[in-house]
Amino acid sequence: MLEIEIENEELISPDPTQKVQKTFDLTQLKLSKKEEDKKTGKIRMLYGNNSEYFGRVDKNKKKGRGELTLPNKDKYVGKFNNDLFDGKGVYTWANGDIYEGDFKNGIMEGRACITFVNGDVYEGGVKNGKKDGAGVYKSKKMDSIYNGMFSNDECTGCGVWENEKLRYDGYFKNGKRDGEGVEIFYPEKYNMKNPPLKFVGHFKEGERDGLGVKEFKNGLKYDGNFVKGKREGQGKLVWPKEDRNGEINIKVFSGNFKNDKPAEGKGSLIWGPETNYNSYDGEFKNGKFNGKGKLKKNDGEEYDGNFEDGIYHGFGKLKKKMENYITVISIKKYMMAKVN
């Protein structure tokens, strides 16, 4: 009845972007006794915890360009003001992550390029030590790139995410697709008989959720509601099916869906002109006509009555067009024909 073959691709979600590490708290640095009398100029300052500073100072406070090696093996090279990182600088963490960009009052803030030890790279805005504003994030693991807005270290706002299998253009929230968006699939990258081509609709917490339209390579198209990535609720499904002669017949089902499949309840099914059938309007169960319904055939035959498992069954009226006249027949508990 509703012979629909739909392979659902695994939803590809962006990996969480790497968090920016905190820099060392410079208030923890204490000068050794022999360095306390140094006041101004370009000097080397030694600290009691195996760290050192080489650069300019003013009244014993770091100011201007300098190099600071910290007790945890982090290193900073750049501008200082009033003993704090301030201006352009490069901060290298002991694990290999590198921040190159702006600092303000000891905090990473402004524009920067951050290279992570896992190969990921971020270029864009930074606020209060976190990715913020417009930026570009390249993920080595997924061979993907995100170009868009960030907030609180996460992809949030409008952006474009792309890898070898698909391109998403839309809204994000806390690193996940959330809001209106468009997915463009690259079908040659999917090992599927009928790969997807495009999805336009709503997302929630990384899943297709809400109204949307999804199209497939063979012409199949679903227009309706989604819940957590699956067809759920009211929708319309248009799909082609090749017959024995190689001709493509189009069917259109409108009704209720549950867990990706046509569900129990009222719906309608329309066939293309190439088939024997015209339309069905009535009740469905398990993808078959069940309950009350009306079936029309292209030869003029109509049946209005009860169905069971896709066949005439129970009370109903059958109108058959025979040459120049129509016969009306009442039937009860009689199997007339199976609808293919």
Report residues per predicted region.
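Intrinsically disordered, low-complexity repeat tracts enriched in Gly/Pro/Ser/Thr and acidic residues
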Residues: 1-340
